[in-house]
Amino acid sequence: MRHIIRKTFMLAAALLLLAGNLRADEGMWLLGRTDKKAMDVARSLGLQLTDAELYGEDGTSLKDCVVDFGDYCSGVIVSKDGLLFTNHHCGYRAIQQLSTTDDDILGNGFVARTRQEERPVEGLYVKVWQRAEDITAQVEDSLQKIYSNQTLGRKLGRQRQAVLYSQYLGRILMDIAAAAEQKAGQDGQKGIVCEAKAFEGGRLYLLNFYRQYSDVRLVFTVPQTLGKFGGDTDNWMWPRQTADFSVFRIYADAQGQPADYAAENVPLQPKRWARVSIDGFDQGSYCMTIGYPGSTSRYLSSYGIDERVNVTNIPMIQVRGKKQEVWTRWMRQDRSVGIKYASKYASSSNYWKNSQGMNEAVSRLGIIEQKQEKEQEIRRWFSADKERRARFARMFPTLKKSYKARHDARYASGFVNETFFRGMEIVNFGRLASTYAASHPNYRQTVVDYMRTAYKDYDPRVDEETMAVLLENYAQQVSSKYIPRFYSVIRKKYGNDYRAYAHDIFTKSKLTTFEGWYGLTNAKVRSSVQIADSLEQAVLDEKAYRQYVESDPAVALAKQVQEMSESVITAPLTRTAPTIAYNENLLTQAVLEMEMDKPHYSDANFTQRMSFGIVSDYTNAGTHHDFLTTMPSLIEKIEKHGDNPDYAMQAEILALLKSHDYGRYADKKSGELPLCFLTTNDITGGNSGSPMFNGRGELIGLAFDGNWDALSSDISFDANLTRCIGVDIRFVLWLMEKWGKADHLVNEVMGK
């Protein structure tokens, strides 16, 4: 009874907070720098950990078991032997890399029965955050020196300052990070990588220290029918029944230090790992995520939001839809293509659908209008003070003018990039070929390594059809100003037969294979760097080399696209970018100053953040959405929608799902197996794989998605609608035990 009373009180407190100025769910907070008011809210909701238990620099706090998974996802260490949980879609690229038609672990799943069977993943790494240093004074001092040197004592105009800030800030931050890494190496610290980043619109700069582990091995994955259950149909939707998890292990050298892959490496022995709870939760239970959210734009101006929706997202949605139709057809008819294109299709379609949801939500919720009202409030605030007027009065007119000035070029740029460099892979290969010779030798090897990997997952038949479809589509979407020269050849020589033109390109180009690409780019390099009889001869060699490379039709096509872009797109984008960035930062600073009495968090930038909230259902447009899904809903989807490939399931797995053999993982109230659940946590891309903790810091799930009704949350958080979707840890462990027969792994996780 006392437990029930406490839960009821916590839920009531949460609802009161949701109605107040400080919402219980909004915020991506920097651990170690979290506002006291925010922490008070977290504790009122059920957080039982001290600040020191959340964040410390000795390796034993909760933040130390949370990892940056490959610089694109999050993950959590769950055992004393470095076992790691993340999402299936985060491990998808690694799983696909290890799959072949003969050993299709993507389709069939994989269980390592012994440590020796765990499979190393080339190029995969994880980073464990160590600490952060405030470098604000150092960055500002460096910027002031640059401003002084550039102006020679004259007054620095705002436009010039914006250009200099944009031009030099990145270099300053990189230099600070590089110096810190070098010092760490000199001090004998292995695997330390540093990143310096801006926060609060440039009011704060932090240097983050990470320990990077480059020997990460696949241990367990379910078949993609479970790990991607629902596919594109259910992506960003609720209710969900996706077993979105995969299991890896971190390895280190014999001394426990980061090391590249070696057979003799041993499992990492972390100082801290997450304990798991299978006790479950209720409506209103405390839930906390810790992870690496990639990017949000909560302080973005109304002009910036309008650009995101109507200029940036529209080309992505339109072109990717065409591309993915071609890819899907090939992937379904040829399993080898299905494996090769699995990861890049998933990445493409994820943001394609997200952009559609964002545009729909921004319109439905009136986000731009809400932001315009906020901007009126800001105008009234700075107009009331002379000093504030001087700083901020030109901010909004400048943003309006600058966004308008780049509108057409930005829109066209979206179609160029999505069509030629993200759509037609051979054109991107051609672009890299044309710049290869001018590259530094060290960078050349990086390009070669990238190309070798890219061609492993490439099928020229698919790309040829994609080229034909996208070339025709591009001509229909942009004005004549943005049409490259080769379109006249398509019209005159091929009679606008795009398939014939594409077939000719692919028949004549050397870039359809890695061997062809490498042979083309290296054919003349050796002779051009030999000691020449004269300087003129050396120059002639380089010229001949470039002519040879550019004679390839795919390279020539890429070059003409770049020439068109440089002629009519690059200038307006380059001219306006510094001004927009500077004034958007200024807007952020204005908001923080105007609301200095309120807790504020910085926009996400792939640094470790904590979000706190509660397990919660929601209602939208009269439809109620429960906070939990259970096994019957999964079985119902499979049986009702068997004609949809996204809901396909192997007969033997369906039999297991129907077995009702849930054991200790069954929900204590319903007796059913919990699958996925909703919370009010504030997440975004990059948070995928983030551990979801209860108030005691015990793992109850893995965050993997947001909900369609609030896909505008990267721009504006709606506490009534925005929900985080997580996979219940009981579903995870049940599948490991019952499908995978991996008792050894379950026991490791449970500490037995």
What do the PLM-derived regions correspond to, one by one?
Residues M1-M10:
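Bacterial N-terminal signal peptides that target proteins for export
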Residues M10-A19:
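Bacterial N-terminal signal peptides
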Residues R2, G20-K752:
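Terminal presequence/propeptide segments associated with secretion/organelle targeting
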